[in-house]
Design a protein with these regions (language model features):
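Beta-propeller blade termini and top-face loops
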Residues: 1-282
Length: 282
């Protein structure tokens, strides 16, 4: 990517190299990013040398984009922040409030305050105070949902950009991170949940979502589809299937997995499985 500055109305442009990757999802030292999907830019209304950039996270510069420091980090690891994947920044000219649009909704702050990684790592929380304005917005896009077979009202649902959520009959809880995908509620154990994130990363909770562990359902380390399928054989309790390039099966309640197919035939390009179903009563 490139960051360019003009001081003559666009007649000439200067390239700035901030020395960090402000589009990445980490601390700026790692490659990658999603600039074709999430990208936002705002210049301070009273000081043109102060610039804010949004990629996965939010970064700020006080020297006209020569150097950048973090302003918000999506995992909440270093204190309250905003959701990942920034799309647009806007300033209200009368109040000075700044509005941030991202995959999690809409946030407002009176001032975007630049922080530093050293302070964050040393336990000093992000100084910017955010108000989440997303409550009541019916905009979440769900990929998969499962309901309990023995407890009315229990649900688990995976949502684009907004993790996997569990409903215990009275309240919703966010239980697994990432983009929420396929999932499962154990009919024999009200506290056992299985959920997944993009490309077939599966997680299990045995305490109703308060803690979780990674589950390796992919013994051959194959690629999975964006919404990698997970199905249970309810006629044979403890038998599960997942689909990557091939179908994997577990006969011991998800502890061990083995491939049961060898797709594709020679000469045919491999593709990820996008749907699985178990025949009832057979």
């Amino acid at each position: 990517y490139g960051f360019y500055v003009t001081n003559d109305g666009g007649a000439n442009w200067q390239y700035r190299n901030p020395g960090v990757n402000v589009l990445s999802g980490g601390d700026g030292t790692n490659p990658g990013g999603q600039g074709t999907y999430d990208l936002a830019l705002l210049v301070n209304a009273t000081d043109p040398d102060v610039v804010y950039v949004g990629g996965v996270n939010i970064w700020g510069s006080s020297d006209a984009a020569r150097n950048f420091d973090p302003l918000a980090y999506w995992t909440l690891e270093y204190g309250p922040s905003v959701h990942a994947d920034q799309h647009f920044f806007a300033r209200q000219p009368l109040t000075g409030n700044i509005f941030v649009c991202n995959d999690g909704g809409l946030y407002r702050t009176a001032d975007m305050i630049i922080h530093s990684w050293d302070d964050a790592i040393n336990g000093i929380p992000w100084p910017t105070l955010w108000t989440n304005l997303s409550d009541g917005m019916a905009t979440t896009s769900f990929y998969r949902i499962s309901s309990s077979r023995n407890a009315t009202g229990r649900l688990i649902a995976g949502a684009q950009d907004n993790s996997t959520s569990y409903y215990d009959g009275g309240q919703w809880y966010s239980v697994f991170g990432g983009d929420g995908m396929d999932n499962y509620l154990d009919p024999a154990d009200d506290f056992r949940l299985i959920g997944s994130s993009q490309f077939g990363n599966f997680y299990e909770s045995l305490d109703g979502g308060f803690s979780a562990n990674f589950v390796n359902t992919n013994p051959n380390n194959e690629d999975g589809e964006w919404t990698t399928p997970f199905v249970a054989d309810y006629d044979n309790p403890g038998v599960f299937y997942t689909g990557y390039y091939n179908v994997n099966r577990s006969d011991d309640n998800g502890f061990n997995w083995n491939p049961i197919s060898s797709f594709p035939p020679n000469g045919v390009a491999q593709t990820e499985i996008c749907a699985l179903a178990v025949a009832p009563n057979d």
